Amino acid sequence: MDIVEEKLPIGPEEVAEAAAVLQKYKAGKAALDKRLVDNELWFRMGHWKNYQNPMMEGKPQPSSGWLFNSIANKHADAMDNYPAPNVLPRAADDEQTARVLSSILPVVLEQADYEQVYSDTWWRKLKQGTGVKGVFWDPEAHGGLGEIAIRPMNLLMLYWEPGVEDIQTSPNFFSLRMENTRQLETRWPQLKGHSASVLDVPRFLHDGGLDTTEKSVVVDWYYKKPDAEGRVLLHYCKFCNGVVLYASENDPALAGRGFYDHGKYPFVFDPLFMEEDSPAGFGYIDVMKECQTAIDRMNHAMDENVLLASKQRYVLSDTAGVNEEELADLSRDIVHVVGRLGDDSFRPLQTAGLQGNSLSYRNSRIEELKAISGNRDMTQGGTAGGVTAASAIAALQEAGSKLSRDMLKSAYRAFARECYLILDLMRQFYDEERVFRIVGAAGQNEFVPFSGAALRPQPAGTVGGVELGSREPVFDIVVSAEKKSTFSRLSQNETAKECYQLGFFAPANADAALAALEMMDFEGIEKVRQRVRQNGTLAMQLAVLQSRLTAQEQPGKAAVTGPADNLSTKAAADAMGLGKENR
């Protein structure tokens, strides 16, 4: 009796259909792919390779670094404001869990080498107009225990349905990468005999070329599919050269659950300047190309002019009788001539030097490029004439950095979405308790245990013998800058010194200081208010102690005149009930 194999949900036919959808997505993204390749050349100052300019043919192709300098400064601003997450609970019952998450999330990010991911993504965001990060679960990490992995993604190798603004609304999402065919066959034996690559992917241009003859395109296919109950599940399939390597629908443990419980594509897009009907945006290179091209052409013409003006050339008649080889050889002191020379047959050829208006025009185009990119001299530490006061320079730098602050806000919003994905992966995969080393409030190392059970639905209790079901903890992510720029630190320190000099922290001035703080706004103001309130409360308690001690004094002894001057620390602590705690 023949055994009929059960047909798997995902097989060669489904993969062929997915490949056809991928080709359609590639056609809709062709213009964006061409722009990405072109922008990479611009960033490497090799953009003349894409232009067949008759003026440049056979001549040096100068590429000044004004565009590169603008992008490098934007990247430096981003690294000066490296983000840090703060988890806030939406219910009082989850406050302790939120406090623990605020401590361990930076550790998870550090273990995932997030600072390098953050840097690489910012380079791509500035060059290509969009930074993309992938938040995945790596089941092979830590010897099979598994861990969260965050990777910078190459926008050139990502595909979605044309016309959507949010990738989560795309029915399919494809992530491609090139891998060595032999290594793939070793890991997945079913690939043997299918080494011919059936997909072509766009690639960046390299000076030495890129040999892809021994590589195959591996496709990570994510798609959303409703189940019998109407829930939309996220499924995942990895295939190469038409062969299924893994499919979550073929996995009995995930077929009815989905690959990730959060049901979202594990990619976060962060566009620099948004475009309609696309999750990808455009970057600074796209808006600075024309100006940089004009500067390069003027530099080329000016370089040619300087070389011609500095080199002596001559106009010779055929009847001049001058030995041209001896004339061109600058080491010869004597040049032989046949016959007589005259101005009509031999004269120097003069080349006009650069005009002042030409230099002024080129400088104006350079200033235009700086203005377009928001990369004024003041943002790099330079100042205008007559500005010497430190406060004035700081004010100019702060006013000139508003474009950087705007970019950082969009990056922080993307970072918050990444943190939400991390929490969802913790909820799904942190089955075993893990121990994280954190820095405590006093600066000492603490070891905090944590598992996904703290994030999963908790019993809501009973009322009148009726169970209220379960409640899943929900949190909010607030992002702040962990690494601040030198100016931000100096500004914060100056604010603290001014508050101290004005007597904000004097206990007797607590009420007036709180009134002033109500009209102020700066980072960390809540901590300052809390400290001022504590100082005011301490002053009131000391005043009450003073009155009590004065009333109990024996006649003839001097009265205590000050709340903090004549009252000993021990007596104050004992009277306030702190003595027992300190023993």
Predicted regions and their residues:
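Acidic/polar low-complexity segments with low predicted structural confidence
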Residues: 280, 284-288
